[in-house]
Each structure stands twice: as C-alpha cells, then as structure tokens.
C-alpha cells in the first residue's frame, strides 16, 4: 500500500494555526472537494474544466494534497489541448487521487475531535 500524497508538515501547521477551527477546515475541504469532483465529471467545456481545476488546485495545495494539486494543475494547463478521452482520464485520475487522500483528512478530523 502506498502512502497518500499528503504533506504532513502542511497539516501540522494548519492544525496549529487553526486550533479549534481545524475540524471545520477539514470538513470544508472535503465537502468542497466532492462538489468540485462532481463539477469536473459533469462538464466537458474546457473553460469550465480549467476554472474548476484552478479552484481545486488551490485548495488541494493549501491542504497539502501534493499529487492532487499537480493533477489539477495539469488539467488547468492542458484542458484546451487534450482530447476528450485524455480529459476524461485526467478527471478520473483526479477522482482516484482524492479517493486515496480523503481518508487522511477523515482521520485528521477524527483525531481533532478526540483531542
């Protein structure tokens, strides 16, 4: 099993800075990410893909989801140049990466609520 692509140092800093609001930040990230994934799957428009990928990239980067941010950057930068099949694969890769890292944030949320 591979280790999810999450920068734990970023989470440590966020936990320290956000203190009691950290669980809410995690909830917001998880909920917003689900909405962004839904939007990515629902659209075939390159401009909408780029906009959604840009937004998702920013939040993923802020939350330390390194590989997720890289995949979103790829989609944002290349949405107009890739074939529909390649775009669908990239969206699937983003979805898969989020599925891989989501448990890290769920665990963080659980840990924050118990301490």
Enumerate the language-model features and the residues they cover.
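Two-component system phosphorelay core
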Residues: 1-51, 55-115
């Amino acid at each position: 099993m591979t280790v999810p692509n999450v920068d734990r140092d970023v989470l440590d800093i966020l936990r320290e800075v956000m203190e009691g609001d950290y669980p809410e930040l995690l909830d917001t990230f998880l909920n917003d990410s689900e909405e962004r994934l839904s939007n990515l799957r629902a659209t075939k428009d390159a401009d909408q893909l780029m906009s959604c990928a840009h937004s998702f990239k920013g939040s993923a980067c802020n939350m330390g989801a390194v590989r997720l941010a890289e995949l979103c950057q790829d989609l944002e930068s290349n949405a107009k140049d890739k074939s529909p099949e390649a775009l669908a694969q990239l969206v699937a890769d983003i979805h898969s990466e989020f599925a891989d890292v989501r448990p890290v944030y769920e665990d963080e949320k659980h840990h924050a609520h118990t301490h």
